[in-house]
Amino acid sequence: MTVGISVEKGKQDTPPLELHYLGDKVLRQKAKRIAKVDDEIRTLAKEMLQTMYSSQGIGLAAPQVGVNKRLIVIDTDPENPANAPLVLINPEIKKFGQQLCPFEEGCLSIPGVHLDVIRPDEIEVSYRDEQGKPKRIKASGLLSRVIQHEIDHLDGVMFVDRVENEIALSSQLKQRGFALKSVQRIA
């Protein structure tokens, strides 16, 4: 699960990419598969990691920086220099575990909003790494949740679409200046 992309884990004064926020239509588009993993994709992944670290996040999907590609970056332990980030290109969940669990989620595209979302605790995911090699991992706990959250972004879904507590959702969105009409409930 190591990445061949070297990135300093720290906040930059000016992150290389600009985040997009709830209400921006780019976040609701289904991202396109990446046909070829090349230096352009590796550069994008590196800049996404730099932007994620600068924003104090643990995951970021390409649509969140206005890029309509199926690419996500994750680091569930950004304070630990020894923990290598993950780059997942064209990730696809192959299997969901049966145990569902609620957990509070937040999102760099909806700053300040933190609400419980119910998701499977375990998943199995296939993807290509930053060299274009096919990979498959089993993930549980926080890593599983972050992968699911970021893959949702690739499908135009945001975590607030999955929140069941409508009162808390409405309240937090309003407090942070986001419109409830931007939420697209998942049935």
From Swiss-Prot:
Hydrolase is among the record's keywords: yes
Record GO terms (molecular function): metal ion binding; peptide deformylase activity
Keyword Hydrolase among UniProt keywords: yes
Substrates-to-products reaction catalysed: N-terminal N-formyl-L-methionyl-[peptide] + H2O = N-terminal L-methionyl-[peptide] + formate
Residue spans crossing the bilayer: none
Entry keywords, A to Z: Hydrolase, Iron, Metal-binding, Protein biosynthesis
Originating organism: Picosynechococcus sp. (strain ATCC 27264 / PCC 7002 / PR-6) (Agmenellum quadruplicatum)
Enzyme class: hydrolase
Active site per database record: E150
Listed CDD domains: Pep_deformylase (cd00487)
Family listed: Belongs to the polypeptide deformylase family.
Cofactor: Fe(2+)
EC number(s) from the headed UniProt entry: 3.5.1.88
Cofactor remark: Binds 1 Fe(2+) ion.
Binding residue positions for Fe cation: C107, H149, H153
Coiled coil region boundaries: none
PANTHER family to which the protein is assigned, alphabetical: PEPTIDE DEFORMYLASE
Full protein name: Peptide deformylase
